[in-house]
Amino acid sequence: MSLITVDQANRVFHLHNQTLSYIFAVEQGGTLSHLYFGGHVDHYHGELRYPRVDRGFSGNLPGSTDRTFSRDTLPKEYSTAGEMDYHLPAAIVRHTDGANALYLVYQGYRIEAGKPKLSGLPAAFVEDETEAETLTIVLVDQVSQVEFDLQYTIYRDRPVVTRSVQVCNQGDHAVNLEKVASMQIDFTDRQFETITLPGAHANERHPERGSINYGIQTFGSLRGTSSHQMNPFLALVDHTTTEFSGDAYGFNLVYSGNHAFELEKDQLDQLHLMVGINSYNFNWQLKAGATFQTPEVLMVYTNKGLNAMSQAYHHLIRERVVRSEFKNQERPIVVNNWEATFFDFNEAKLKPIVDEAKQLGIEMFVLDDGWFGHRDDDNSSLGDWQVDHRKFPQGLNHFVKYVHEQGLKFGIWLEPEMISYDSKLYQQHPDYLMQVPGRSPSPSRNQYILDLGRQAVRNNIFDQLDQLLKSKQIDYIKWDMNRHLSDIYSVALPPERQGEVYHRYVLGLYELLERLTTAYPHILFEGCSGGGGRFDAGMAYYMPQIWASDNTDAVARLTIQYGTSLAYPISLATAHVSVSPNQQTGRETSMSTRSAVAASGVLGYELDLTQLSSADKQIVQKQVVQYKQIRPLIQFGEFYRLKSPITSNQAAWMFVSPQQDEAIVMVFNLTSYAQPSLTKTKLVGLNPKLNYQNIATKAIFGGDELMQLGFYDPVVYQDYTTKVYHFKAVTEN
């Protein structure tokens, strides 16, 4: 069955699969009008065309006497500046005469099986061309001959449409792109609310639900990365939408740099949404014959609530964004030495941690910051990716060999995008540092940024890392970025092209990652940026897991991991057990609670194992054994949010196997108080016709019973307690 239907007579395009339809049409003057995005309809018969009304101060097409048609009031697929549309434009193009007028007129379309790659950018993909179909709509400005190709891909078996734009300069003169959104969509007669994922360093992705008022709202980042402060994701929901019912529209930008989600509610209560690269300090010179490709937006629609939206993203990102050979493999349990030692370590100090990890069943040791150059603190050596022989007198290979002899894999921390003043790299290539001529650059964590937009810089870093990786038996890389961009300038570009620096940095990063992951496909890469400061689908394309937050406090992590799950799969989010009291919050929590929260993602440990009490070591050893047993279920099962730590004094979630024959349920109590109310937990996602046994108590319940009646939570007079339930389907005697 074709996924794209074209009504040639009425010039209507209908993208459809079993769950959704996306419909738009070519209107008067060659303008694209958005008609519908929502649940599946078999056929569109043309009745839902926008009513034509003469509206004051909303002008008409040039040369037309029809006062009822206006681009200012028409719901559109892509708006531009200068055409008497007073909404925020999706695109702004500056011509050689200084004007920014752009009248994009429909020229034609192309349909192809599958999904083409995007040049230089990460994007969702297909493994077989029957999985999806792609529609390209060609729009051209007749005066400048600048062409906009609007790219739509619909998946056959996923509630997903992806969108991006390619701009082609078919004219004779260069133009400047001052804004190019990846997509636009206009809604009429909908009273939506937004769900966004704002945050801060060590406090990322706290879901916020808000109303939409008249005027313009922008959610985005100006930090050069996707940021801790505002994740590149937004959902539009009805005010009645819950976790398990109601319309939910998700928009997830596959990009790791400055981004913007712009909402405009207009005079007619129409909602106008644009998503793409933030136009702040963006100005791209597009020469004659050149093209520019925008990042991709992953759009999801469901009428079954937020959990269904999240599950669509979980499957899509895990299966068709992450490319690594590890995407379907169980991830190793690691111990990282950072919170155990910080910079104060040597080989002799690390070996006991490795020995203890072996005894506890941990599978990988990760050597964090401080192993290279002469780095005893954060003031030096970034850019010098050679081992510090003071700490490893016999070389790094000697220590790696020791780790492997204990039966553990070996991982290492890198921060390749940064440079220290006190480094050999800076002494040799001071021009590699990003700074504005005549001005002192701003430090952050005593470090500075390499200009990754330059090929020479990328080659230098690649060559250093290549030497490190090809001579060592390294199994894992933690790729960190501990500051945001500032002092935006590149000595490789002329003054009139400095507006390209932000985007060229991201493109350079992607090119470097492409080279490394291609050269070393058997190394597991984990992304990090001071925790979750670059937790986005663009990085997931190269790295199948990302450090969710530098905050390892179990209670804080409940909200962080809850919010992360809205748009990203569990297998992407790493979570570690650390010491108590926690080093970020000072909060005390039990080992069992810390373990359960960390086991709700890709489990690891971030502490000095040699300092654990005998009792805690037994808990860790037991928890490692248990996690290994349920690891496929946690990392690749269906995830359901049951109770929100934001709106209640509990958090609860569960993991269900694809066959619905096994489930793990975790219920977390927050603060204790006298005479607490009785609470129940109702499960979801089970087979109502099966019986399930509680593995701990041997009690048997029907699937329908667990979902309809649920069970009472224990009354516990203690803060931050956790109850974990393990159910398996059984045949009742």
Curated annotation (Swiss-Prot):
Keywords: Glycosidase, Hydrolase. The active site is at 480 (nucleophile), 550 (proton donor). It catalyses: Hydrolysis of terminal, non-reducing alpha-D-galactose residues in alpha-D-galactosides, including galactose oligosaccharides, galactomannans and galactolipids. Its EC number is 3.2.1.22. GO terms for biological process: carbohydrate catabolic process. Pfam families: Glyco_hydro_36C (PF16874), Glyco_hydro_36N (PF16875), Melibiase (PF02065). The keyword Hydrolase applies. One of its GO terms (molecular function) is alpha-galactosidase activity. The keyword Protease does not apply. Belongs to the glycosyl hydrolase 36 family. PANTHER family: ALPHA-GALACTOSIDASE C-RELATED, GLYCOSIDASE FAMILY 31. Alpha-galactosidase associated with the raffinose operon. This is Alpha-galactosidase 1. It comes from Pediococcus pentosaceus.
